[in-house]
Amino acid sequence: MALSTPETLCKAALTASLSLCAAGALAAPVEPSSIEPEPLKLTAEWDKVFAQSNWVAHEKITFVNRYGITLAADLYKPKTGGSFAAIAVSGPFGAVKEQSSGLYAQTLAERGFLTIAFDPSFTGESGGKPRYVASPDINTEDFSAAVDYLATRGDVNPERIGILGICGWGGMALNAAAADTRIKATVASTMYDMSRVNARGYFDAMNEEGRYELRKTLNERRTLDYKAGRYTLAGGLPDERPAEPQFVADYWDYYKTERGYHKRSLNSNGGWNTTSSLSFINMPLLTYAGEIRSAVLLVHGEKAHSRYFSEDAFKLLKGENKSLVIVPGANHTDLYDKKIPFDTIENFFSTYLK
């Protein structure tokens, strides 16, 4: 009997897969699913937390992800015309496109890129039920669905598409870059690894016993929610600004004040579904970060409580086209609006989306 090698095993697996496909072809015909957007109610007025630019054109657009969920986005396009490099932007975790992601997108459009800022599935103006739930799989797919949309626009060069994720969507962006070879450049700004923080707590303070108790509590909540016929919200930020911890006060300063409050933002209001964290606990986002071949830029604030997420993610990345930039004096939310290093981000995308 001949010894199996990795090559023969791969060939065997491929043969088995093709055999299954052939068997399926002989069975009763099944019509392929069509991509059908659901009707969304989109606002017509400018309701962002930042001023509208006179240098770019703006319009509302929609696209559909691989799970059939229709996503809503703001498109920002330079008024110069021509074929553009394009960037899809989303985040922070619990925010909407009218907040930080829209500011990133509009500013990068002023610098020559066609951009979209989208609401993730189940949030903002995007579709999907139940509302206010997060998923490491579906929300990673949201980025790839944005690439689907951009790659099929006549004014976008499909070989020049990048993505930018803020806060929790920074980790999603890295996961998308590991899976989607069409993505040529990725920026993760002030990133969270949502799998890590949900499974281990802040600063990895949660042990196995703590995880067990958390799972127990969340699964009991599932039963209660099902009995009640509705999903309980975890609650957003407190009504009054907390004295500590400082990073929660920083969040409050953005989401609960005129600086960043928005009526559709989960963080500005009732928060996520309580059980949303369950899927993140057992599904690590950065498993294949070391296999990302395209360019990656990690940006984080020097004084951010979350800085360790970017520093540890950077250790996983391989290749000379990966970089980590620490913004002096910046905390986590400073990179939502106040201290975003747009020159650095522009130079990165200009270099790798040629």
Model region roles, listed by residue range:
Residues 292, 298-300:
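Short beta-strand/loop motif that positions the catalytic acidic residue
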Residues 107-127:
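Conserved alpha/beta-hydrolase
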Residues 174-256:
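Alpha/beta-hydrolase-fold enzymes
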Residues 35-82:
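N-terminal cap/lid segment of alpha/beta-hydrolase-fold proteins
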Residues 330-339:
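Catalytic histidine-centered segment of alpha/beta-hydrolase-like enzymes
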Residues 83-92:
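Short beta-strand element of the alpha/beta-hydrolase
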Residues 133-154:
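Alpha/beta-hydrolase active-site loop
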Residues 94-106, 120:
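The serine-hydrolase catalytic nucleophile loop
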